[in-house]
Amino acid sequence: MGPGARLAALLAVLALGTGDPERAAARGDTFSALTSVARALAPERRLLGLLRRYLRGEEARLRDLTRFYDKVLSLHEDSTTPVANPLLAFTLIKRLQSDWRNVVHSLEASENIRALKDGYEKVEQDLPAFEDLEGAARALMRLQDVYMLNVKGLARGVFQRVTGSAITDLYSPKRLFSLTGDDCFQVGKVAYDMGDYYHAIPWLEEAVSLFRGSYGEWKTEDEASLEDALDHLAFAYFRAGNVSCALSLSREFLLYSPDNKRMARNVLKYERLLAESPNHVVAEAVIQRPNIPHLQTRDTYEGLCQTLGSQPTLYQIPSLYCSYETNSNAYLLLQPIRKEVIHLEPYIALYHDFVSDSEAQKIRELAEPWLQRSVVASGEKQLQVEYRISKSAWLKDTVDPKLVTLNHRIAALTGLDVRPPYAEYLQVVNYGIGGHYEPHFDHATSPSSPLYRMKSGNRVATFMIYLSSVEAGGATAFIYANLSVPVVRNAALFWWNLHRSGEGDSDTLHAGCPVLVGDKWVANKWIHEYGQEFRRPCSSSPED
């Protein structure tokens, strides 16, 4: 098998090849890439057009109903209206026999709503699935956890970190988008259905608070009500061990729905539990945050993400420096790259303005039709997982001349051979709502890894290009190196994954922090060991 065939085989195994656009548009994956979320605006615009036509039709129908109402009312307001008049008597009987029936069973009303329903059914297949709602809700919980966001603030559209009594504004949107009681209920219910009461309770509490404030108002788009929120919150508190709160909320529920026998039985049950063991069940239980999947480095990872890439103490280290880099290559002599060395062991460098705006845009445009849900290696299988939320596509070097130029620039800057099969095709990634990639290595850590099927060794280096900027979040966190690098538009981040001995460098454990606000795009060029023997020779020291 030739080098090119081996590379193609690897990408087929990874299930991340250039792909099929129709497969890329699978329902249930909208939340996993911001570009897919943006595409969901198109069907909603079509729905708005349908609703506008429906409203216009209903306005005309209501004007006609108002005319009919005023006409009949005027007859009833005149107490002297003589029913002895055969004309009036006839019209009265006609109204009661046919006019009112026509009004109540108006064909116009049914035609208006039928047109709206038919239009909805035509675009329904293009709408996000329930799995997208679940994914978006889990994304809000992820942001809540990693950035220590206050749920009440989020419901008001404010991104605030709360630590004890201190409140820090992480991001101030130009326009506030507040959530409704029904919005908060749906987030809480996703957690509730997973048995995750740590997240369910604050969201359901906010739902109850908002529903209380608007009780009696009817909103046609709402699926839930105050009673629904009280019901779920009461049971969540009970499962969390707080019977006192469960009882209080259940009693409030019965004020609104006194005939609910199930809730009445719950009240009796909670009262009995409190009477039997008041000291045990009155005290508010401490609810542990779930750690699924188990992540040993979670606290370090989240602490680095919370810096949002701002770590000024790094710039006090004398051995770190900035320079104009040519790598003694003629290709870069007339246009050197601005280089910022941000860590030495492992070696990590940031190259500013590595690509232009037009190049970044072109790469995004080339990749967008082929984006598919990102997967991770699990043994010899490739799986979609909750700890990696993004979509990705692979672009062959020959797809566009700009990619050829990009490869020449990477090769000139790194001094490495980036031609297939010594390097993989360019992987372009678009992150989703709260998109992230929890701590991982880029190099293979198992002999059974699909990476070895390229027959070109392990991934010796990573060259990651930021193709966009973000408003907040999305930093690249190096866990054991204890630093995070913010998203810098058009810059490229480079690091060695392997020591010169060929052993993996455990200090390169890194993560993509959740995107708080913004649309994050990156492009990865992974360079393999083979082909670099004389470009990065081995060392007698295993630590080099």
From Swiss-Prot:
Bound cofactor: record note: Binds 1 Fe(2+) ion per subunit.
The entry marks the following residues as binding Fe cation, namely H440, D442, H510
List the signal peptide residues: 1-19
Q: Which reaction does it catalyse?
A: L-prolyl-[collagen] + 2-oxoglutarate + O2 = trans-4-hydroxy-L-prolyl-[collagen] + succinate + CO2
Q: In which tissues is it expressed?
A: Highly expressed in placenta, liver and fetal skin. Weakly expressed in fetal epiphyseal cartilage, fetal liver, fibroblast, lung and skeletal muscle. Expressed also in fibrous cap of carotid atherosclerotic lesions.
User: What biological function has been recorded for the protein in this entry?
Assistant: Catalyzes the post-translational formation of 4-hydroxyproline in -Xaa-Pro-Gly- sequences in collagens and other proteins.
Q: Could you tell me what this protein is called?
A: Prolyl 4-hydroxylase subunit alpha-3
Which organism does this record belong to?
Homo sapiens (Human)
Q: Which gene encodes it?
A: P4HA3
